[in-house]
Amino acid sequence: MPIVLPDSSAWIEYFRASGHPSDLELVDLIDEEAELVITEPVVMEVLAGARSESHAIKMRTALLAYPLAKVFGLDDYETAAAIRRACRAGGETVRSTMDCLIAAVAIRESASVLHSDRDFDVIAQHTELHIHPLGA
């Protein structure tokens, strides 16, 4: 099974137990002990939405149970900028530069992204980014 990098949008649905397709897929991947990775921008985005410090600690513990695909400094930031430019050159705008950074890490790690954020679909149209299919 390929490596999957769940975006913060998928983790947020998961922590809310929302029943959203990305929540259900993440539950399945966790139950199947799929190869999941996490990256610093996802940790930051998820923890920023914590309701309290104790909630942040619980979420952090859950997230960091998975291997960390670290951001490789300037290289990944430059790749993220190139991703945003490629999308813009293709006539589409990526709303979040953070999503470009997450995509840069996923591409480098050959990981597919599980998400509920349209930016990743746009990025995948203009780069080598793979999207993890829901219900896979």
Task: Give residue ranges: language-model regions.
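Short beta-strand scaffold positions
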Residues: 6, 38, 71, 114-115
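Conserved glycosyltransferase catalytic-site signature
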Residues: 8, 40, 96-100
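Short active-site oxyanion
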Residues: 1, 32-36, 65-67, 107-112
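A generic structural signal for short hydrophobic patches within well-formed alpha-helices
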Residues: 11-12, 43-46, 120
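Short, well-structured N-terminal submotif of metal-dependent ribonuclease cores
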Residues: 1-38, 48-61
